[in-house]
Amino acid sequence: MNRKKIIVAVVIVALLAAIGYGWSYYRQQQDATLTLYGNVDIRTVNLGFRVSGRLASLAVDEGDKIQPGEVLGKLDDGPYVNALKQAQANVQSAQAQLALLKAGYREEEIAQVRSEVSQREAAFSYADSFLKRQQGLWANKATSANELENARTARNQAQANLQASKDKLAQYLSGNRPQEIAQAEANLAQSEAELAQAQLNLQDTTLLSPSGGTVLTRAVEPGTILSASNTVFTLSLTDPVWVRAYVSERHLGQAIPGTEVEVFTDGRPDKPYHGKIGFVSPTAEFTPKSVETPDLRTDLVYRLRIIITDADESLRQGMPVTVRFVQP
C-alpha cells in the first residue's frame, strides 16, 4: 500500500514538474523579444533649376538647415523678363486682331466700297456702250478690227472690276468669315499659352526648397552657366527618417505593418527611438553585407522599412541600429 502511494506521489510530482517546465518554456517564448539589425536610411534629393542660364547667386551653403519654400538660389532673369514682355505683346496683338475681326467693317469702309461699286458700274456702262458703237461701226465697215477688239477688252475688264467691287461689298456687309475668326481665336490661344510658359520660366529662375532638410553638397558657384536640371544642391530630407532592416522567414509573421518597435543606436543604448513598421517587401533576398547581424549571410530575408516617429539630428545616413519589437 505504501509502495502504491509512493508511485502515485512520484507520478504527480513528475507531472507537476513537466507542467511547470512547459509553462516556463511557454513564458520564455512569449517574453522573447524579436531583435533585428539594420541601418538608418535618410532620403536625399538633388535640386536644380528647370531652366538654363547663368547662376546669379546662392543663398545657402553646405551644412545649412533649410525650411520648405526657402529661396536657395537665383539665375540671371534678364532673358526671361524680355521673353515675358514679348509674350505679353503677342497676346495683346492677337486680342486686337480678334476684336477687329469680330467687330466687322466700319460704316465708313462700307460707304467707301459702295462708292467704288457705283464708279465701276458707271465705267462698265460706258465701256459696254462704247463696245456696242464699235460693233455698229464694224458692221458698216467704219472701224478697224483692232478698235473693235480694244473696245471688247475694255468692256470685259470693266465688268470684272465691277464684279470684284460687288463681291467686296457683299463681304463687308456680311462681316468676316467664321473661319477667319476661328483662326484668330486659335492664334490668341497660342499666344496665351506662350505667355503662361514665359511666366513659368521666369518663376523657375528662383530655386526653392521643396522640403525641410540639411544641405549636403553645394555643387556649383555663382557665374556658372547651367543647363536645365543640372544639380545645384543635394539635400538631406528631415522627414521621413527610415530604418532599413531585414527579417528572416521564420520571424516574418511578427513583422506586420503598423507594429511598434524600438530602435537603438550605439550612442544611445539606453534611450531608444520609437517607430512603426511601414513596409514589408513581398520578395526575399540574401542578407546584404552592410547589415550587422549574427544570422548567416546565406539566409533569405525580407526587407523592412521602419518609420522613426521621434527622429532627431543624431540619426545619420547609414548608421547601424538595433531594432527590437515592443511586446504588447
From Swiss-Prot:
GO cellular component: periplasmic space
Signal peptide coordinates: 1-22
InterPro entries (UniProt xref): CusB_D23 (IPR032317), UPF0194_membrane_YbhG (IPR022936), UPF0194_transport (IPR050465)
Disulfide bond sites: none
Keyword terms of this UniProt record: Coiled coil, Periplasm, Signal
One Pfam family this sequence matches: HlyD_D23
Subcellular location: Periplasm
Major location (coarse): periplasm
Coiled coil: 80-109, 139-208
Protein family membership: Belongs to the UPF0194 family.
PANTHER family cross-referenced by the UniProt entry: EFFLUX SYSTEM COMPONENT YKNX-RELATED (PTHR32347), UPF0194 MEMBRANE PROTEIN YBHG (PTHR32347:SF29)
Name this protein carries in UniProt: UPF0194 membrane protein YE2891
Organism: Yersinia enterocolitica serotype O:8 / biotype 1B (strain NCTC 13174 / 8081)
